[in-house]
Amino acid sequence: MKYLTTASGTPVSTTTFGTMQFGGNADAHQSHAMFDAARNAGITHFDTAVGYTEGASETLLGQFIKPERDAIYLATKVGYVGGASRANMTAHFDQCRKQLDQDNVDLLYLHRFDDDTDLEETFTTFADFQQRGLIRHIGVSNFAAWQIMKAQSIAQKLGTCIDVIQPMYSLVKRQAEVEIFQVAQDQDIQIIPYSPLGGGLLTGKYARGETGRLTDDSRYNARYNQTWMHDTARNLAVLGADIATDPATLAVAWVAAHPAKPSPIISGRSTIQLAPSLAAENYTMSTDLYDTITALSLSPPPATDRLEEA
């Protein structure tokens, strides 16, 4: 498995901090406090996107990393809106660099697959950014396994490759186990999964009657509204209480403990909310505990759907 390094050659942290809340649910003061907490916990990998909080996320992150840029692995994303054409990617990336106040970034993702743009145009653009020293690594987010392989074959013909993928993955969203993780291992691609807490479901707060994205955002409610998912969250909270460990810590550490060695993206609205996820950075999960947690949710069927041979 490929391991990423900062520009100074230091391996990046095994946990990534996502800044989607910066400048939105977290104001500048709260955002800076979370950034400092992440750095104090040893996190060096920070993830953002051109459109997060209408650009405020990149602007704040750019300010925070400036005093120690060489120690930070900086990732951002383009193409969630407007597609993966050269013109749109270039316009977005120019906007990224302006908002971040950076000439270059370590990792640039295409935020999602674009059915309407030839992948050769997309990856010719990526390769050009690399050759000009504007990016070090290439990533794709929200791609299916076949899309990753098709893109990888084109990238390799252009003399480059996909270095990182960013799929959704958590105890209640395990589809990535079916083919995406295997593709990544086969192609030596680093896995940086998002939403290890299942939109906050796995913190246990919804079982306590609290509110959050699942109650406030119809997209998240639709994503995590199945009864078995809520049962899994309740059972994880019970397990956490039994072993005196916050369920959020267990959820993030479980993702990181997968044999494919993913590096989960954590986030929060405040340092208090962030703390249990940060604790996973140094949490050692035994094989027995990993298996116990795995059994709390439904395993996806194999790609062949031959369950008797799984």
Roles of regions detected by a PLM:
Residues 1-72:
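N-terminal binding-site loop/beta-alpha segment at the start of enzyme catalytic domains
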Residues 97-116:
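Active-site groove signature of glycoside hydrolases
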Residues 7, 40, 62-70, 94-101, ...:
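Acidic (Asp/Glu)-rich catalytic clusters
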Residues 13-18, 46-48, 74-76, 105-110, ...:
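Hydrophobic faces of well-ordered beta-strands that scaffold small-molecule active sites
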Residues 20-22, 49-51, 77-81, 110-113, ...:
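Active-site beta-loop-alpha junctions enriched in small/polar residues
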Residues 26-38, 85-100, 123-124, 148-152:
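Short, acidic/polar
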Residues 3, 119-296, 300, 307-310:
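Beta/alpha (TIM)-barrel catalytic core signal, keyed to glycine-rich beta->alpha loops juxtaposed to Asp/Glu
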Residues 67, 71-87, 111-112:
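Structural motif corresponding to the early beta-alpha repeats
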